[in-house]
UniProtKB/Swiss-Prot annotation:
<keyword id="KW-0408">Iron</keyword>
<feature type="binding site" description="axial binding residue">
    <location>
        <position position="526"/>
    </location>
    <ligand>
        <name>heme</name>
    </ligand>
</feature>
<feature type="transmembrane region" description="Helical">
    <location>
        <begin position="37"/>
        <end position="57"/>
    </location>
</feature>
<dbReference type="InterPro" id="IPR001128">
    <property type="entry name" value="Cyt_P450"/>
</dbReference>
<keyword id="KW-0472">Membrane</keyword>
<feature type="transmembrane region" description="Helical">
    <location>
        <begin position="7"/>
        <end position="27"/>
    </location>
</feature>
<dbReference type="GO" id="GO:0005506">
    <property type="term" value="F:iron ion binding"/>
</dbReference>
<keyword id="KW-1133">Transmembrane helix</keyword>
<feature type="glycosylation site" description="N-linked (GlcNAc...) asparagine">
    <location>
        <position position="434"/>
    </location>
</feature>
<comment type="pathway">
    <text>Secondary metabolite biosynthesis.</text>
</comment>
<dbReference type="InterPro" id="IPR047146">
    <property type="entry name" value="Cyt_P450_E_CYP52_fungi"/>
</dbReference>
<dbReference type="GO" id="GO:0016705">
    <property type="term" value="F:oxidoreductase activity, acting on paired donors, with incorporation or reduction of molecular oxygen"/>
</dbReference>
<dbReference type="GO" id="GO:0020037">
    <property type="term" value="F:heme binding"/>
</dbReference>
<dbReference type="InterPro" id="IPR036396">
    <property type="entry name" value="Cyt_P450_sf"/>
</dbReference>
<comment type="similarity">
    <text>Belongs to the cytochrome P450 family.</text>
</comment>
<dbReference type="InterPro" id="IPR017972">
    <property type="entry name" value="Cyt_P450_CS"/>
</dbReference>
<protein>
    <recommendedName>
        <fullName>Cytochrome P450 monooxygenase 75</fullName>
        <ecNumber>1.-.-.-</ecNumber>
    </recommendedName>
</protein>
Length: 613
């Protein structure tokens, strides 16, 4: 049985902290033995107690001095520094945790960038870290200087209990191997699984319509999370978890129901397997986000047990039988002489799932488990989050809704199933999705660690480059970058899909493509980008075909999940006007769900479809 993360961490830290006092005692004992001078107990005790903080202070001072000299040697400077008010800058850590729990996304980062510039140095508990929203620095980290950055040991330790050694938690040769193993599956032909999208979207829309007919609002975030989970499990494993078969939740003041979205805190005592799996996914990711926020001291929160252990048990109970069945099929095929096709032939096999593809390449159950879980989390949460925010904006901006629906009816019609060619022609649909991804990128923060020392570009053309020490974390926030007016213009806070269609494209985006990074960039750019665009586009088209109007229903949400009233007075940018509370674990989500009401379209032929729930 593995030890809880906190136990070995505490042992390591105790040994480190005890080193200086032990040295003091050894020196005092040496003096007494070789000079017959017995030092008084009180100065030895005082020096022993003070030796640890003094050692830490000296190490921090020396590190800063060394960095300053190294920067001068390279003709560089250190970025502006966020200086805290408490020992070890613990107030900085406290403010970041408070923002995560009770604030608006990137509150603390926005304040820093406004006061100190778009790249800031932080020193918490003696460690140096950088925070940036500068597109040129992000470009350096993700692309031009890619080989000098990695996920880093600390990040991988924080994520290991959930992501294992999967593609999102691997570096170097391991990452290259995972990437090469997965890439062939995500070709244009494979990601056009529109029959799957059609079947699942019809189920989802039917569930919504039934609830609307009963006079209730629907938590769209819950519903779309079921749609993406069912689509992802069928697409990736060929075995659907069928979460859409479970009842939808009711508004907070209506009938109590089984679990909906974990943020609503309405988990029933006996949820279905699908509901339990969905809940476990989100709760595990919340733990991971808290670990990242705590930094190196995260194991202190897990002294008795791993906080992801129970959630992963539920997930593994679902995944393990699927993996064992796939490996058994592979063995059976080998036994009857069917053999394994060469890669080229197999890559063209119709109906092959990602798991089928991976099983042809490896029989290692741990590798298979980690890889499919990584892809499942990415395939479910990112798409669900974006579609949730698209529907929010369509409710907030009826003119955008009407224009988008008009494009759908013109290009596809009120009943037809959209094709890949249809979606390619729908420029306004893509603009709506992109504008949503700009204001609410599903991964608001990300991190890389430098391997060697180097420099980062200074936004001041006349300034010296910024020095980057080795083994230093660089956290970059596309959430803040996507809203900075120096990159997107004076209307950066406004939701306006036309910015991706008019002259602002050439003025801002074409000039610097790295100001828009919803799918990351460089060698680690999202492999499933086109799959996500196809899935989101398909579902939105179906939504426009079925419904002629939509509006928010905040009265249906738990009152404590709504934005605090003071945001309208003290908030910055969109924080002042938003009608939902965005939060983040690994990806963005809406606190308490996204409750909406919709009006069924008169021009949709309800008899034209045969939908089974």
């Amino acid at each position: 049985m593995a030890l809880p993360p906190g136990v070995p961490f505490l042992i390591r830290v105790s040994l480190i902290l005890a080193f200086a006092p032990v040295c003091v005692v050894i020196v005092a004992n040496f003096i007494w033995r070789h000079t017959d001078v017995a030092l008084p107990t009180w100065p030895v005790t005082l020096l022993s107690v003070a030796s640890t903080p003094l050692t830490i202070l000296v190490r921090v001072w020396y590190r800063q001095w060394k960095y300053q000299r190294a920067a001068a040697r390279l003709g560089a400077i250190m970025p502006p520094r966020w200086v805290g008010k408490k020992l070890g800058n613990l107030d900085i850590l406290k403010e970041m945790l408070q923002t995560m729990q009770s604030g608006y996304i990137a509150d603390f980062a926005w304040k820093l960038f406004n006061n100190l510039g778009n790249t800031v140095q932080m020193n918490v508990l003696g460690g140096t870290a950088y925070l940036t929203c500068d597109p040129n620095i992000i470009k350096s980290v993700l692309a031009t200087d890619f080989n000098n950055f990695e996920k880093g040991d600390l990040f991988k330790q924080e994520m290991a209990s959930v992501l294992g050694t999967g593609v999102f938690n691997a570096d170097g040769d391991m990452w290259k191997w995972h990437r090469a193993m997965t890439r062939p599956f995500f070709s244009r032909d494979r990601i056009s699984h529109f029959e799957l999208f059609d079947r699942r979207s019809e189920q989802a829309v039917a569930k919504m319509t039934e609830r609307f007919h009963s006079g209730y609002a629907v938590d769209f975030q819950d519903l779309i999370s079921r749609f993406t989970l069912d689509s992802a499990t069928e697409f990736l494993f060929g075995s659907c978890v069928n979460s859409l078969h479970s009842p939808l939740p009711y508004p907070h003041n209506q009938h109590p129901t089984p679990f909906s979205h974990p943020s609503s805190k309405s988990l029933a005592s006996n949820p279905s397997r699908a509901e339990a799996v969905a809940s476990a996914f989100m709760r595990a990711q919340i733990v991971l986000a808290e670990r990242v926020a705590m930094g190196a001291i995260w194991p202190l929160l897990e002294m008795r047990k791993s906080r992801t252990g129970e959630h992963m048990r539920i997930i593994d109970e679902y995944l393990d039988p699927i993996l064992k069945d796939a490996l058994r099929r592979k063995e059976d095929m080998a036994n009857i002489g069917a053999g394994i096709h060469d890669d080229k032939e197999s890559s063209d096999t119709d109906g092959e799932t990602l798991l089928d593809h991976l099983v042809r390449l490896t029989s290692d159950p741990v590798v298979l488990h980690d890889e499919v879980l990584n892809i499942l989390i990415a395939g479910r949460d990112t798409t669900a989050g974006t579609l949730t925010f698209v529907v929010y904006f369509l409710c907030m901006y009826p003119d955008v809704f009407n224009r988008l629906r008009a494009e759908v009816l013109e290009k596809v019609g009120p009943n037809a199933r959209p094709t890949y060619a249809d979606i390619k022609e729908m420029r306004y649909l893509r603009a709506v999705i992109n504008e949503t991804l700009r204001l609410y990128p599903v991964v608001p923060f990300n991190i890389r660690w430098s391997i060697h020392e180097g420099t980062l570009p200074n936004p001041d053309p006349n300034g010296k480059p910024f020095y980057l020490p080795p083994k230093t974390p660089v956290t970059y926030t596309v959430f803040a970058m996507h809203r900075r007016k120096e990159y997107w213009g004076p209307d950066a806070d406004e939701f306006d899909p036309d910015r991706f269609l008019d002259d602002r494209v050439a003025k801002y985006l074409t000039k610097n493509p790295f100001i828009f990074l919803p799918f990351n960039a460089g060698p680690r750019i999202c492999l499933g980008q086109q799959f996500a665009y196809n899935e989101m586009s398909f579902f939105l088209i179906k939504l426009m075909q079925h419904f002629s109007a939509m509006e928010l229903a905040p009265e249906a949400a738990p009152p404590e999940s709504l934005p605090p009233a003071e945001w309208a007075v003290t908030g910055w940018g969109r924080k002042r006007i938003e009608r939902f509370w965005p939060k983040s674990h690994l990806t963005l989500y809406s606190n308490g769900g996204m409750w909406v009401k919709m009006v069924e379209a008169d021009d949709f032929d309800k008899d034209d479809r045969d939908v089974g729930i």
